[in-house]
Amino acid sequence: DKTTDMVFYVESEEEVTELIRLAEEYDVCLIPFGGGTSVSSALKLPDLETRMIVAVDIRRMNKIEWINADDRRACIQAGITGKQMEEELAQHGYMVGHEPDSVEFSTLGGWIATQASGMKKNRYGNIEDIIENITVITPRGILEQTEPTTRVSMGMRPQNLLFGSEGNLGIITKAVVRIHQLPEVQEYASAVFPTWDRGVDFLHDLSRTNYVPASVRLVDNIQFRFGQALKPHPEGLKKVMASLQKFVVLNLKGLDPYKMCAATFVMEGEAREVAYQKQNLLQLAKQHQGIAAGPENGKRGYMLTFAIAYIRDFLSNYHIIGETMETSVPWSKISEVCQVATDKLLELHDKHNIPGRPYLSCRIPQIYHTGVCIYFMFGMYMKGID
């Protein structure tokens, strides 16, 4: 594989401007780099590129330039990570609420360039809903709005071209984002369903209500069992309660441990709002044969999300290669897409004579009016495979 010839660490817009000028003068290819968490191969260097390639690391441009509490806006440099941004805003009582799985390492500029979506988009929106102004430096100058605007109804907004641009139009240096006051209450909840299809039906009905929580996720049976296997061994009273809960679910309710799936929820806002959401969504789950599984399981499910990348890196030491992929699917095609993806992976696994059996699981991390996002995780044992 090709590698970059040089890496530049920029600390200001002046340095970015000068670097772009030099790149144009000497015919050098620049590739912006943020957290490096992209899974779309956008950072893979083009095989046919013959120019010198320079990676431009923007992570030193990581400051919050200003906060406007009255208008609930903040101007933030593009190299800041999600984790740092939320920690610094929280010191002033604010948050952005954009929380992709990669929030620990991914950057604001990267979110814009990849048109990212966060797990709490139901409450705070996707990145295109959060951003009100973008500053991007191009070979022909700086592109930005004169002032951030709440909404524009006349003419085109050039900044909209930057969402999903993957660094092809210039280097994003900062953005004005919408901020929110820290929520009064944050609660987790969870529910288990007898089958994946039951869980999907629940999500479909939930999407048509007025009590959709900040985040809702549905994991299939394989991912559910994987999460259960990683749970710490309970002791004392927790051990008794865990055994009792397991007895109720498997014996009294009759759920099959090899078919059941689980949904997890995050609710944020005022206490009354959160209580309303929790009561109604668990009642709806019950109508779909769902069983409330408690806040701790909900919280653990979300914590596992952030641990997956570390688990993947750990398993690579033992020749197990893991990866993820996701796609948007209309409600009517969910089961079909999951089945086709499973069949295709098994087919390719056999075709290339890879040992063992692949791990493949899926989850629905986001719901929309017309469909969902399906997130696939797979792993294969690759020892001895070139």
Where is each model-derived feature located?
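FAD-binding subdomain of flavoenzyme oxidoreductases
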Residues: 62-219, 231
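Glycine-rich N-terminal segment of FAD-binding domains in flavoprotein oxidoreductases
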Residues: 1-59
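Short, well-ordered beta-strand elements within core beta-sheets of diverse protein domains
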Residues: 5-11, 179, 187-194, 265-267, ...
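Beta-rich nucleic-acid/ligand-interaction surfaces
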Residues: 39-41, 105-109, 224-225, 245
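C-terminal substrate-recognition/cap domain of FAD-linked oxidoreductases
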Residues: 1, 200-386
